Amino acid sequence: MRLGVIADDFTGSVDIAGFLVAGGMRTIMCSRPVVVGDSDAIVMSLKIRSIPKSEAVKQVLEALAFLQQAGCDRFYYKYCSTFDSTSEGNIGPITDALREALNCSTTLICPALPVNGRTVFHGYLFVKDELLSDSPMRHHPLNPMHDSKLARILSSQSPAKNGHIYYDVIAKGSIAVRKAIEELKADGVNNIIVDVIDDEDLLVIAEATEDFSLVTGGSGLAQGIAHRWRERSGKAADLNAAFVVERRKAVVIAGSCSAMMQKQVAYYKKLAPSLSINEQACLDDPEYAKIVAAWVLEHQDQVLAPMVYATRSPSELEENRKKFGDADVSSAIEQMFSRLTGLLADKKVQNFIVGGGETSGVVATTLGVDAYLIGRQIDPGVSWVRSLDGAYQLVLKSGNFGSVEFLEKAQEMYDGNH
């Protein structure tokens, strides 16, 4: 088996690649077709979570063609474990397009990532002890999640038929799950939504779906797939796939407004120089990025990297909506972050620790990094990565991932420390 993964944003790519590497699979991550050497998995990193459906599907099918040409024979559409996708979202249409392209009538819907508190019970997605719709994800600026029932979300996006395998079946093991799958297939179900409470459930599901040419989900299922691959191949986890992270000029850029990112920013502000982005300047001042870059460069003599952040609380976001009206503040901030990244790279800043999927995409694109070595995980779902030419070392973190101390912990890994 050579696994081909299509991930819908940069941080999601790092997330799943890290789990595959931890599971022993030699993994290459890229954002465009490249010559891939010897590997067990290829992760194609796209930025399609919040773009128009037609363009998202087009990019996915192009990525699929590349992965097929690269010798992949099993495929994994990776989206966020919080299923970031409203009624106008792309998960349903992309899943439909992949099923059609691969000529498979049925696939799996498995967003769960128990290690980070994302579980599914009776088809409802939970974030720790809260329904998704009751969690801070209801305030997400791009994809506010107001429903927790996965089948309802998918039905609002796609005419495909949805079915469930509930926890009472999962608990009976892979043979029972296979039987349930066959019954759902016979009933014409296209998307099988599976309950997952813990990592053991993921192993059961991975074993039961080994003959699926296409699965979809968060990164949790990758743990199960890697585990099964390791059992079948007889190979051990290859820790040599990781690299030693070097201390270099660095910056922390926080663009996410997630609840965890807010906690991480608040914690890190007590430890290192920090600068809150001025939204008005992002909109009006084309020279603002130069001012911010100068500030970052002035603070390179600290033990911990200076932080530039646009992280805001829900009340602050609401104030901004009232203040700026129809102005596209998010786009202006991203454009500023892109200019900032370019200016810092010109001044030999080589370590970028980035919080937020959209912001991570902007930074990686600006740096022109399109293929990566995957390092050891900092926290579940987040690893250091290095550009293949060694020029840049990056942390591309989903806003919700990582511990409160994450931004500090990432830098404690310099020079081989753990």
Residue ranges and their predicted role:
Residues I16-G18, S87-I91, R118-F126, A176-V177, ...:
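Short acidic, glycine/serine/threonine-rich loops at helix termini
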Residues M1-G4, C30, A56, L64-R74, ...:
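Cap/lid and interdomain-hinge subdomains that line or gate substrate/regulatory clefts
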Residues R2-A7, I42-S50, D73-D84, D195, ...:
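Short glycine-rich or small-residue beta-strand-to-loop segments that form or flank ligand, phosphate
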Residues K128-W295:
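Conserved, well-structured core segments that form the ligand-binding/active-site neighborhood
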Residues V349, E358-F406:
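Conserved, well-ordered active-site substructure
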Residues V296-G355:
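C-terminal structural cap/anchor segments
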Residues M1-D38, K58-E62, A112-V115:
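N-terminal basic/disordered segments at the start of proteins
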